[in-house]
Amino acid sequence: MNDPKVIVALDYDNLADALAFVDKIDPSTCRLKVGKEMFTLFGPDFVRELHKRGFSVFLDLKFHDIPNTCSKAVKAAAELGVWMVNVHASGGERMMAASREILEPYGKERPLLIGVTVLTSMESADLQGIGILSAPQDHVLRLATLAKNAGLDGVVCSAQEASLLKQHLGREFKLVTPGIRPAGSEQGDQRRIMTPAQAIASGSDYLVIGRPITQAAHPEVVLEEINSSLV
């Protein structure tokens, strides 16, 4: 596959277990997401190890800081050679624009820069608790519009928001969707969920899937089934 849609979320606290899983799957069938836990435990060397094995990596560290600090972190991700990196859109337009600008020298080799809108675990009551009175969907659209204006390539959003965002922000604006569970999977701690085929039909470009693949006895088979359902 030239542009695999599935991004497998690696959530391991043991390096040997993570690499044992990775060695069961084919880099042409998916990409890999490295988040805060694994990056804190194993650092950039783990990402390099995945690159050596032929995988594209989404570095999911959700940077959120003053523009200068955030942009330098994004530059460090570009130096590491990752395929995608993200920042919190709630950091504001100046922070996002600085992060996008610092990637200019990398040209076509630069990572995709993605904004994080509303975490998929958050519901209206959670937003109200931090003083945001808008409905989740309205707040997502506001933050995603800000991200597009700042020059970002796309946003992380739930599948429920995908069609709305494509409609408002255009086909080229990439939508990365977590909270994806193949039919029959456990819901876990993601509140707003959909199956892979439903999410792609709704406008998602990339699907983040974790435990249904990483905890499967035969992850390569599960990946094949998911990819087949997207054709």
Swiss-Prot record:
Keyword Cytoplasm on entry: no
Active site, renumbered: K62
Residues bound to substrate: 11, 33, 60-69, 120, 181, 190, 210-211
Keywords: Decarboxylase, Lyase, Pyrimidine biosynthesis
Signal peptide: none
GO CC annotations on file: cytosol
Metal-binding recorded as keyword: no
Function: Catalyzes the decarboxylation of orotidine 5'-monophosphate (OMP) to uridine 5'-monophosphate (UMP).
Family: Belongs to the OMP decarboxylase family. Type 1 subfamily.
PANTHER family for this protein: OROTIDINE 5'-PHOSPHATE DECARBOXYLASE (PTHR32119:SF2)
Assembly behavior: Homodimer.
Protein name per UniProt: Orotidine 5'-phosphate decarboxylase
The organism's taxonomic lineage, starting at the top: Bacteria, Pseudomonadati, Pseudomonadota, Gammaproteobacteria, Vibrionales
